[in-house]
């Protein structure tokens, strides 16, 4: 196809010169039957619009080259190329027309044909079943002929990936990292002059869309940790492996966007939850909050189970699946980086986590009860007897935690070794979250159905063990001071497991779908807790402080257990097998 321009502005005809015009039919038959006239009309209309925006008023004529018969290998001409390869999960036909120069203010909007910011390429995506045109191809990207050994064409539209620094909408690769314009400018300013940023907290501030400007130190620290550098190569010069990784992430974000989990959902706006009621749980499980119906046990109030009183709104937790004819879809990532077809869930990711947590909590308390230890017997236990009793009481809770982890979206899709590492790194942390449901602040005791065990009766001669006892008590107090509902404890527990996937203190693997789930659950927790604290910034810092305290206490448990094993290896071998399996190996 060629474009001719006539009129008084012939010296500006370079505006309409195109570098290529390419499409891929699924079959030779489709290549013959393709509706070329529809494409010609669309591109002609877009070209006229371009000239109108440029104050040019040429008359245009579209010339179509003579058709050629296609042989088995396909045919090519200078204007169009036929490649009869099967293309999975891509539109039937992709057209692009590139112009050498485009006015800065030129934009084409609408659902049929678009041109992006600073782009010089008009793109049509044609479905032969509907003859519908839509799409955009980013700067410096073009479709090429597919090699014979490939079945999927990936256009690296990196702008669908959120900013790696703050989670805002990205604008491309800047200084070697996919970032938004704000973080690009911030990093540029930090490198253009001598700066001396200071962190007012513990150098672990949250950097996101809401508070990215609150701590320049932590923002720059995150930029550097992600690899931003003035010497970083541009996207077009990335290695093949790096490009493939980015393209995989692009596909993931397209899947999420198609199913209602785009960056707006993953990195959702921080706004108060709706005024109408969501999941309401019996808060009387905390003895110092005497509201609701409770069961008195030795002077303390607890509740074993919680039930929803009203349906949970779909947008309560920031991850609202899209709906087609009443059917909701959510994206899952399978092992190896591929994405299966959308599945139909009963609930959104946060609701499923809460439901699984409630089920395991109910099952655990029904089968094993809580705090079945007579506190009068504890002072008479030997050191080995104390460890054995502790491990025996913890063992059924560990089993419930494992079942809960298996129900979290994406967990079972991870490699088995990764699942084991995640459990080793988080089982004790989640045990603290479960225990917080039965902790009474006034008595500083864990209250069960038969007994209440105050921390004052727990005395250890070993310094590491005594420090662990004190820190467990302090950690439970800090969790309970958040006044969390059981639904919020569920979100906190799931977040502690999944956070290790990408965090510096965890196992540090790259599984973008699991990371997206973790972000969704984290935002759900923030939005649910925020009304009680007053502002989002304080909410984030409070929850982060609690998470840090939980992780530190889990490390103390590991250190105390290691000391016990070294000082009394014979007695440590008598500990339950599951407990030893999860805690005697090195923790990630």
Swiss-Prot record:
GO CC entries: chromatin; nucleus
Pfam families documented for this protein: Hormone_recep (PF00104), zf-C4 (PF00105)
Domain of life: Eukaryota
Phenotype upon loss of function: RNAi-mediated knockdown in the adult causes abnormally small larval progeny, difficulties in shedding old cuticles after molts and larval arrest at the L3 or L4 stage. Up to three previous cuticle segments may remain attached near the tail. Less than 1% of affected larvae survive to adulthood and in all cases have a strong Dumpy (short and fat) phenotype. Defects in gonad morphogenesis and seam cell (lateral epidermis) development. Knockdown in L1 larvae causes the majority of affected individuals to have defects in the L3/L4 molt.
Region (Disordered) residue spans: 50-73
GO biological process: defense response to Gram-negative bacterium; molting cycle, collagen and cuticulin-based cuticle; positive regulation of transcription by RNA polymerase II; regulation of transcription by RNA polymerase II; spermatogenesis
Localization annotation: Nucleus
Keywords from the named record: Developmental protein, DNA-binding, Metal-binding, Nucleus, Receptor, Transcription, Transcription regulation, Zinc, Zinc-finger
Record function comment: Orphan nuclear receptor. Transcription factor. Modulates expression of target genes, such as Period protein homolog lin-42 and microRNA let-7, by binding to hormone response elements (HRE). Involved in promoting oscillatory expression of the primary transcripts of let-7 and paralogous microRNAs miR-48, miR-84, and miR-241. Plays a role in normal development and required to regulate each larval molt.
Protein name: Nuclear hormone receptor family member nhr-23
Annotated gene: nhr-23
